[in-house]
Amino acid sequence: MAWIKRKFGERPPPKRLTKEAMRNYLKERGDQTVLILHAKVAQKSYGNEKRFFCPPPCVYLMGSGWKKKKEQMERDGCSEQESQPCAFIGIGNSDQEMQQLNLEGKNYCTAKTLYISDSDKRKHFMLSVKMFYGNSDDIGVFLSKRIKVISKPSKKKQSLKNADLCIASGTKVALFNRLRSQTVSTRYLHVEGGNFHASSQQWGAFFIHLLDDDESEGEEFTVRDGYIHYGQTVKLVCSVTGMALPRLIIRKVDKQTALLDADDPVSQLHKCAFYLKDTERMYLCLSQERIIQFQATPCPKEPNKEMINDGASWTIISTDKAEYTFYEGMGPVLAPVTPVPVVESLQLNGGGDVAMLELTGQNFTPNLRVWFGDVEAETMYRCGESMLCVVPDISAFREGWRWVRQPVQVPVTLVRNDGIIYSTSLTFTYTPEPGPRPHCSAAGAILRANSSQVPPNESNTNSEGSYTNASTNSTSVTSSTATVVS
């Protein structure tokens, strides 16, 4: 019997993922996902003031893997407190202390007291979320998307020259209402239990779609590209539930009036009102937690204005989301799971004897391998944003097949050399060919992203594996429309 001698404190070698472990993962999908939701811009604080980020950044722990991990740790002798995930959040600089997030008993937490001072000269920054378990086992450090620092909302008539402050059709926004500028009275548009409501605790991210003025009301509607301007017809669709409000016309707010003739681009942190189209001056309004219709009053001396109440004035801001998914395929690991690689696109190169797939994304490292289903592919690391791999032959999935007879779709995942599986939500499809071409190892790739967003212009492959792009300016979107109480 051979004994393996190790020095004291030396870590055991990492376990490589087995084919069987990958099959179990693909069957059960017990992922652990960290979501960081935040605004795309943050207002700077001057002197001793603290302008807390609004809406507050929010961290969600999603996926069945968190519960399974907790149960596994408790089976291995950990107490309930030791198996509890802990998190701290900060703005990525050493001057400001990180703030603890309270995740006990729930899967989300908001960071309500983050701010950036004028002594911090950065024009952009990223939130940093440090996570570990109660027994001090490290989970890792997760970064948000990039946040732009602004001094204050632009009062000037906005132009498209400042495109990064404008709001494009099809992007996500949050809407909040603050009575008499009091922070404690802030309420956010949110969907819960199939209803729109004004929440003081959670905020929703809504797709804002630009519609043609003559688009009729319906669950299906055609959206337009371009930046949102005041006076245009828009549709707000919850990015989580798909629920939508009726057609709205977005109007600029000046003091307590809605301007009927404003047509400049909508900008970050502007106050705006939403007129319910084809109604008698009805506006989207909150009354405590309820979302209602409020009837505006015409201004007798100014026909281009309508008087609204405070509850119908909403502040608009673009939002973003960083999403990190991982799974311990060979059991617990000693190293943090971060940096979590994120794959943004796939591109098929070549054909014939060897087809190569190029992966573009972020946080790639040399210790990653690409897997097609339960088949590990030969992988070449290029840099932190690019990897190449050899597409496995179809016979690896369909024994005896020398060419593709019907479409075969396999998930694409990245696997670290210690067995950590990083799901990509992308798939590779072997597509049929008109006749036998035994030397072609891959007929084509089709990228599918499992998201609730409006699909981007998709790439399609023909039988030779080359790409044809189908692009269109309009996209059909299906939603379920909610009625607003009058």
Swiss-Prot record:
Subcellular localization(s) per the UniProt record: Nucleus; Cytoplasm
Residues annotated with N6-acetyllysine modification: K161
PANTHER family with a match to the protein in the record: RECOMBINING BINDING PROTEIN SUPPRESSOR OF HAIRLESS (PTHR10665)
Function: Transcriptional regulator that plays a central role in Notch signaling, a signaling pathway involved in cell-cell communication that regulates a broad spectrum of cell-fate determinations. Acts as a transcriptional repressor when it is not associated with Notch proteins. When associated with some NICD product of Notch proteins (Notch intracellular domain), it acts as a transcriptional activator that activates transcription of Notch target genes.
Oligomer and partners: Interacts with activated NOTCH1, NOTCH2 or NOTCH3. Interacts with MINT/SHARP. This interaction may mediate the recruitment of large corepressor complexes containing proteins such as HDAC1, HDAC2, NCOR2, SAP30, FHL1/KYOT2 and CIR1. Interacts with EP300, MAML1 and PTF1A. Interacts with RITA1, leading to nuclear export, prevent the interaction between RBPJ and NICD product and subsequent down-regulation of the Notch signaling pathway. Interacts with SNW1. Interacts with CHCHD2 and CXXC5. Interacts with BEND6 (via BEN domain). Interacts with NKAPL. Interacts with ZMIZ1. Interacts with RBM15.
GO terms under biological process: positive regulation of transcription by RNA polymerase II; positive regulation of transcription of Notch receptor target
Recorded family membership: Belongs to the Su(H) family.
Name of this protein: Recombining binding protein suppressor of hairless
Taxonomic lineage of the native organism: Eukaryota, Metazoa, Chordata, Craniata, Vertebrata
Protein species of origin: Pongo abelii (Sumatran orangutan)
Sorted UniProt keywords: Acetylation, Activator, Cytoplasm, DNA-binding, Notch signaling pathway, Nucleus, Repeat, Repressor, Transcription, Transcription regulation
Annotated Low complexity bias: 468-486
Domain of life: Eukaryota
Biased composition (Polar residues): 451-467
Segments of this protein annotated with the region DNA-binding: 43-53, 151-156, 178-183
InterPro entries: Beta-trefoil_DNA-bd_dom, BTD_sf, CLS_fam, Ig-like_fold, Ig_E-set, p53-like_TF_DNA-bd_sf, RBP-J/Cbf11/Cbf12_DNA-bd, RBP-J/Cbf11_DNA-bd_sf
Main subcellular localisation: nucleus
